[in-house]
Amino acid sequence: MKTILVTGGTGLVGSAIKKVVETTEKRDDEKWVFIGSKDCDLENLEETRELFESVKPTHVIHLAAMVGGLFHNLAHNLQFFRKNMAINDNVLALCHEFDVIKCVSCLSTCIFPDKTSYPIDETMVHLGPPHDSNFGYSYAKRMIDVLNKGYAQEHGRKYTSVVPCNVFGPHDNYNLQSGHVLPALIHKAYVAQRDGTPLQVYGSGTPLRQFIYSIDLARLFIRVVREYEDVEPIILSVNESDEVSIRDAVSAVVKAIDFTGDVEYDTSKADGQFKKTASNEKLLKLFPDFQFTPFEQAIQESVQWFVDNYETARK
């Protein structure tokens, strides 16, 4: 019997994994345990040890992190670095201490070097400094790869990481200050539609992004836990041809929410990196049969969830 502990299990990706393992990917030989920040302070080593003692996991999906959008990162790089370093070191140390067979941690495409060639692939993680806007978060996430390789080299551990592109879906953080681009847009569009005001979008709308639906990412995470045996990271991203501009994303949200007012772009606000195009060649070789949800359908489902759960959504 496998016992799979999911840290950060109540957030965007954790909620999606929970939904998928309770429905289409349910298996009798797996027990899944989802914990959130209310259940355990992973910055505290003793609390984390008590969690591992109580759950006794054979496998771990490590999603817990301090996360935020561009403007939140710009203001708090030190906080993002220290908090995430502490969480990651504790979780991996206890995976080793409790003889966990496999730990799959979650990185992000923003950790890659700012000055790079495209598309980005898994070999490029440490080839130069990340973008200035979120260097604290990026370096802390890169150190997971260093820890994984260290545990493999010294102890033969199979701890690995996945690198998703921009994730969105139900149970996201819709906070207008700290949320990522799509959930913040969905919230803004909802308010603009309700109040009859223009929809204000920060930046020019020209940057390009690959977006992955949280349900698709959940299905991939589960397959990685069950089937991927390498320590090297693997990028979990939609195809390069599925990259969209922020303007395209705004159009999809506007259509899904049926917003008919004016859209205004505030070009005095920062755009962040122009693009972070990632290659999913390794993923497609491993799981050639995988089908992604079309972007507009995923946006429609995400908007519907937010509208239906407006009172209780994180915002």
From Swiss-Prot:
Q: Locate the site labelled Important for catalytic activity.
A: 108, 110
Feature type site, description Lowers pKa of active site Tyr: 141
GO molecular function, a single term: GDP-L-fucose synthase activity
- Indicate which residues the UniProt annotation says bind substrate: 188, 209, 271
Q: Name the Pfam families on file.
A: Epimerase (PF01370)
Q: Does the keyword Oxidoreductase apply?
A: yes
For this entry, list what GO says about its biological process: 'de novo' GDP-L-fucose biosynthetic process; GDP-L-fucose biosynthetic process; IRE1-mediated unfolded protein response
What is the top EC class of this enzyme, as a single word? oxidoreductase
- Which pathway is recorded for this entry? Nucleotide-sugar biosynthesis; GDP-L-fucose biosynthesis via de novo pathway; GDP-L-fucose from GDP-alpha-D-mannose: step 2/2
Q: Which InterPro entries match?
A: Epimerase_deHydtase, GDP_fucose/colitose_synth, NAD(P)-bd_dom_sf
Chain sites annotated for binding NADP(+): 8-14, 141, 164-167, 180
Query: Any idea which residues are catalytic in this one?
Result: 137
Write down the EC number.
Answer: 1.1.1.271
Catalytic reaction annotation: GDP-beta-L-fucose + NADP(+) = GDP-4-dehydro-alpha-D-rhamnose + NADPH + H(+)
SUPFAM superfamilies the record matches: NAD(P)-binding Rossmann-fold domains
Which UniProt keywords are listed?
A: Isomerase, Multifunctional enzyme, NADP, Oxidoreductase
Give the protein family: Belongs to the NAD(P)-dependent epimerase/dehydratase family. Fucose synthase subfamily.
Q: What does this protein do?
A: Catalyzes the two-step NADP-dependent conversion of GDP-4-dehydro-6-deoxy-D-mannose to GDP-fucose, involving an epimerase and a reductase reaction.
Q: This chain belongs to which protein, by name?
A: GDP-L-fucose synthase
Source organism per entry reads: Caenorhabditis elegans
